[in-house]
Amino acid sequence: MKPVTEPILLAAANAFDFGGPVVCDGRHYGEGHINDTYLVWRADHSKRFILQRINTDTFTDPVGLMENICGVTRHLSRKILAEGGDPGRECLNVIPTLSGAAYYIDSEGNAWRAYDFVENTVCLQQVGCEADFRTVAETLGKFQNQLADYPASTLHETIARFHDTPNRYANFEKALAADALGRAKTIAPEIAFIRAREKDCHVLLDQLAAGEIPLRVTHNDTKINNVLLDEATGKGICVIDLDTVMPGLSAYDFGDSIRTGANDCAEDEPDQSKVHFDLHLYEVFAKGYLSTAGSTMHTAEKKSLAWGAKLMTLECGIRFLTDYLEGDHYFHIARPNHNLDRARTQFTLVRQMEDVFDQMTAIVCPETDL
């Protein structure tokens, strides 16, 4: 996408109903790399807001995306209010344009949206302590629980087949057959690793097709930094970054949180001896998640959470290796073999999960007959 110019930014800032004139200094805000995010505030400094240009290279249907977000946030607001909470703080609140729309289209055809800024909160970039990880788990579980009665099938698929692991496997095989850069000969162990787990790729979608686990509203990007915590108390406040809210499985959200949080290494750690799956952190997260989401989950769905941890990690590794084979076009790289290092880290975590998989299953579903 083209860089945001000052006139485009000012026009966008003036298009929304912020309750008065606003100021924006033009600097990008936050850690995100997909959308262009800016902090704006009323000229009298009484209130702050988030203004974003939606990346339509990634999200090709911004209208459907905003329909998803508006529907889900309205539902969450009603639930929070009924529970005696504060929907102005515990849920993202979409600011309408001056004409009452949920988004604004600028002169270049780009889509913009705005939210209330949730004051006095922080988002963590990594797991600092067990208590924080449990709080994130409880907040994500509550998010799932509050959306348990939302009609998931009515949501738009904002990124097609995002967690379709069999399709990710098929894309890997296509990239391997093409071998555009001649890299296949250097990754024989990784190829064998993936192929040995081809059947595993189908487990969750087969369970869904058989009616064993339900289709749900899922976030699909449950990194720890997508949960806001109260700056003073550390209490979980709300879940943010709802662009990938789509129909999915609870195992996806649970699994991606485990993939990113229940280990002691960077995602791109080149030294595999430093990569360790942490079963204790897995248990901490599982107990927190089930304490808020478990009441709406039956045995088979709880059992699927362990599969979610394994398959979201495997799927991510497959995606990294596919990008490596295709020339590193999707994931940004900072060094040669960066995506290969990322893939190897995911595969090391998968191996370690497999070593304790019965324990993982027993933690999320003690009633399971192993």
Predicted segment positions?
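Small/polar glycine-rich anion-binding or flexible loop at a beta-alpha turn
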Residues: 302-312
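Conserved active-site aspartate in kinases
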Residues: 241
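Juxta-kinase regulatory segment immediately upstream of eukaryotic protein kinase catalytic domains
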Residues: 1-25
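Long, compositionally biased intrinsically disordered regions
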Residues: 353-356
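Active-site activation/catalytic loop segments of kinase-like enzymes and analogous catalytic loops
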Residues: 251-295, 311-330
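ATP-dependent phospho-/nucleotidyl transfer catalytic cores
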Residues: 27-31, 52-53, 59-63, 118-134, ...
